[in-house]
Design a protein with these regions (language model features):
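Conserved pre-motif I regulatory segment
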Residues: 2-40
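Conserved helicase motor core of P-loop NTPases
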Residues: 5, 29, 37, 154-160, ...
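Conserved SAM-binding loop
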Residues: 18, 72, 267
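Short, conserved phosphate/pyrophosphate- and ester-handling motifs at nucleotide-, phospho-/glycolipid
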Residues: 22, 76, 271, 423
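Generic structural signal for buried aliphatic residues
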Residues: 25, 299, 324, 426-429
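ASCE P-loop NTPase helicase motor core
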Residues: 26-27, 31, 36, 41-45, ...
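Short coil/loop residues immediately preceding or within conserved phosphate-binding loops
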Residues: 39, 321, 413
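C-terminal accessory regions
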Residues: 335-475
Length: 475
């Protein structure tokens, strides 16, 4: 009785008539929310275009109307901003919610698990495919296992429970072969009762979308295991999905910038090296930037940083992948054999402005961040400044507060790799598939392609698309 009332309430907040899949999901959601079992978890999986976002938007709206508490979380600032947009409620990063910075500590661990003081609260996590359970920054956050810490945090609260949402066709976290947060067996390992539903029906509003038509083909190939052959992409009959050759590229990117803005346009490439080539080309030939760094430049953080926003309530660390905009360049200089710049920047996903020191050397490296040998060189050269400090612990304390050692590592952010784009969405995406041989095909490539396709909301441009990928090309 109450169950059907709740289902009806959520349905009324739907922007259109729900699909059969969504009706099933609504019933499961209602059962889950009304269940007496506090140790239950709902896994809501859905492919692009199947209406996960509409479903959750309607759920959040209904929870608010019924004065029930919900908290929205996502793995990155960019993903949290996208989530906030479609759910109509502020979303936070997982790190922001479940960790607290240690106030006075010389330990290497900077953040420890926070206490969950919420009661009777539903936690909804979007883009769960990105949640790792092996920390690259394992000494910094809690146990270093994000999924473990998230589950522990939620279920330590009084009558709190968790919905994990994600797309199993997307890339798993870096260095992992699958997304642990979307694996029901992994989740049952926490002694939770796991219910799951997978949305597969593409909603009617998306039927004319070439992006979703072709993303669905890739998803079907992943489900059927037919990933050792070139994917056949349909280009005819769609206005949002098309080829662009090298001669047209500059003009097309330029018109996307003029029409929708630089912040709504992204080039996705297969390697950091290609991304660097694109970034330089865009700065020189479209933005006409002659200086290495100029006001207005968009930069992407290349490595987590815990120094420049420490203690800031909105943003207590700067995450790898965040995009910042340069407001003004105060000075550039050389020191310790490296080049630095003092700049004022805006964090676009937090509406926050601050002054930082950035490392210019990483702008042109083919590596994702400063390579280890150069990191070591920077560390030991700066360490010499503290020769007068008698103890090793004292030296390390000085290094922890040294602005040059804690410099922000950045890359230009006009073109990025697919892993860096994950969790974000842009109106225009230019995708450079680059040179592909049959040996390079397989599940990883299909996931990469699917993830790249689904970053675009309005238009996807396939740059120099190899003809083997076209539906009507001979195989």
């Amino acid at each position: 009785m109450i169950n059907s009332y709740l289902s009806r309430q959520i349905t009324q907040n739907f922007p259109y008539d729900p699909t059969e899949d969504q009706v099933l999901a609504l019933n499961l959601l209602s059962n889950f929310l009304l269940s007496e079992e506090s140790d239950s978890l709902l896994l809501l999986k859905g492919y692009a275009g199947t209406g996960k976002t509409s479903l959750v938007g309607a759920l959040v709206k209904t929870m608010t109307e019924l004065k029930q508490k919900s908290i929205l979380l996502a793995p990155t600032g960019r993903a949290a901003k996208v989530f906030s947009g479609y759910a109509g409620q502020k979303a936070f990063t997982i790190h922001k919610k479940i960790y607290r910075q240690k106030a006075f500590s010389n330990e290497p661990t900077g953040f420890h698990p926070a206490d969950n003081l919420h009661k009777d609260t539903l936690f909804i996590v979007d883009e769960a495919s990105m949640i790792a359970n092996e920390g690259l920054d394992s000494f910094v956050f809690g146990t270093g296992r994000l999924l473990d810490d998230l589950v522990q945090y939620v279920y330590s609260g009084e009558n709190c429970r968790l919905i994990l949402m994600g797309d199993v066709a997307q890339l798993p976290p870096v260095m992992q072969t699958e997304s642990p947060a979307l694996n029901p067996e992994t989740l049952r390992g926490y002694n939770l009762k796991v219910q799951e539903i997978t949305l597969t029906q593409v909603v009617r509003q998306s039927e004319n979308s070439g992006i979703l038509f072709n993303a669905t083909r890739l998803r079907d190939a992943l489900r059927n295991g037919t990933v050792e052959i070139f994917p056949k992409l349909r280009l005819k009959g769609f206005t949002d999905f098309r080829k662009v050759n090298g001669d047209e590229l500059i003009e097309e990117i330029s018109s996307a910038y003029s029409r929708d803005g630089i912040e709504e346009t992204m080039i996705i490439s297969r390697s950091n090296k290609r991304a660097t080539l694109y970034n330089n080309g865009i700065r020189n030939r479209i933005l006409y930037r002659e200086e290495e760094l100029s006001s207005g430049d968009r930069l992407m953080i290349a490595k987590n940083n815990y120094f420049w926003t420490a203690g800031n309530k909105e943003m207590d660390f700067i995450a790898n992948g965040e995009i910042i905009q340069v407001l003004r360049v105060r000075r550039t200089y050389e020191l310790y054999g490296f080049r630095f710049a003092d700049v004022s920047v805006r964090f676009q996903d937090y509406d926050l402005e601050t002054d930082v020191k950035i490392l210019l050397d990483t702008l042109q490296t083919a590596a994702p961040a400063l390579p280890k040998d150069l990191n070591d060189k920077l560390f030991y050269t700066i360490l010499e400044d503290y020769d007068d400090v008698p103890t090793k612990a004292g030296k390390m304390k000085k290094m922890k507060t040294d602005p040059h050692y804690n410099v922000l590592q950045v890359k230009y952010a006009y073109a990025v790799t697919c892993h860096k784009a994950q969790g974000g969405q842009w109106m225009n995406v230019f995708l450079d598939i680059d040179y592909i041989t049959e040996e390079m095909l397989g599940e990883d490539f299909y996931r990469w392609l699917y993830t790249a396709f689904t970053r675009a909301t309005h238009r996807l441009y396939l740059v120099n698309l190899p003809e083997e990928f076209e539906e009507y090309a001979s195989s």
